[in-house]
C-alpha cells in the first residue's frame, strides 16, 4: 500500500467509544462537576440580585421614613393653636369675641 492508501481510523469515534465504555466514572464525575459549577453560578447570580434589591428597598424605606417625619412636623406646625389664631386674625379678619359679646341660643 502506498502512503496515501493507508486505512484511516476514525479517531473521534474511537475516543468517544473509549470514553463511554471504560471511563464511565470519569464521565459521571465530569457531569457532576459541570452541574455543580452551573448551580454555583446560578446561586451567586440570584444572591447578587437579592442584595441589590435589598439595597433599593432600604433606600426606599429611608425615604419614606424621612417623608413621614416631615409630615409629622408639618402636622404639628399647622395644628398649633397660636398659628391657627394668627391666620384667622390676619387672613380672615376674625376677632376674638369678648364675654359681653357672646350670645347664647337655647331651644
Swiss-Prot record:
Membrane topology according to the record: Single-pass type II membrane protein
GO annotation (BP), single: FtsZ-dependent cytokinesis
GO CC terms, sorted: cell division site; plasma membrane
Sequence ranges on the Cytoplasmic membrane side: 1-24
Protein's cellular compartments: Cell inner membrane
Periplasmic compartment segments: 46-107
Regions crossing the membrane: 25-45
Pfam short name (any one): FtsL
Subunit structure: Part of a complex composed of FtsB, FtsL and FtsQ.
Record-linked NCBIfam families: ftsL_broad
Functional description taken from the UniProt entry: Essential cell division protein. May link together the upstream cell division proteins, which are predominantly cytoplasmic, with the downstream cell division proteins, which are predominantly periplasmic.
Record family assignment: Belongs to the FtsL family.
Name of the featured protein: Cell division protein FtsL
Organism field: Haemophilus influenzae (strain ATCC 51907 / DSM 11121 / KW20 / Rd)
Amino acid at each position: 500500500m502506498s502512503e496515501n492508501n493507508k486505512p484511516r481510523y476514525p479517531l473521534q469515534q474511537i475516543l468517544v467509544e473509549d470514553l463511554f465504555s471504560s471511563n464511565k466514572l470519569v464521565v459521571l464525575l465530569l457531569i457532576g462537576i459541570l452541574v455543580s459549577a452551573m448551580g454555583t453560578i446560578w446561586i451567586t447570580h440570584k444572591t447578587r440580585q437579592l442584595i441589590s434589591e435589598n439595597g433599593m428597598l432600604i433606600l426606599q424605606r429611608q425615604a419614606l421614613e424621612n417623608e413621614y417625619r416631615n409630615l409629622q412636623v408639618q402636622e404639628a406646625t399647622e395644628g398649633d393653636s397660636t398659628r391657627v389664631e394668627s391666620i384667622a386674625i390676619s387672613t380672615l379678619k376674625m376677632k376674638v369675641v369678648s364675654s359681653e359679646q357672646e350670645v347664647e341660643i337655647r331651644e
